[in-house]
Amino acid sequence: NLFDAKLIKNNDKYAVELGGHVVELSEEKQAALKANNVAEQEITLGLRPEHISLSDSGVAAEIDVHELMGSTIHLHANADGKDVVIVVSTMDMTTEQINSLRGGAKINFTFGGNVCHVFSKETNINLEA
């Protein structure tokens, strides 16, 4: 999943903003961005489907298609016009929760500041490298 997002600084800490949702980056990513003297900027944010989690708040999306794959559900959703693939574990979900993840359902998702990837929008270079 690749998103148009913003790299911002709050109290000298780097964070990414996606769909109005702000996630502070991990200490390792903080150090790499500081070492590279990276400024606030528009970025391409990379997120693997298995690193996205459903949440009560976060980035809003609507499920287009769901695929039950045994112990996971693969969700194909739309977040502000952008296609998103999310892989959700069903291990700790009730049948009711699993059944609620159907086409047309409204969801919110988030991600950890340690698992996202920050790329320059202009050069496509990983800003953490």
Residue ranges and their predicted role:
Residues 2, 6-129:
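Non-catalytic connector elements of ABC transporters
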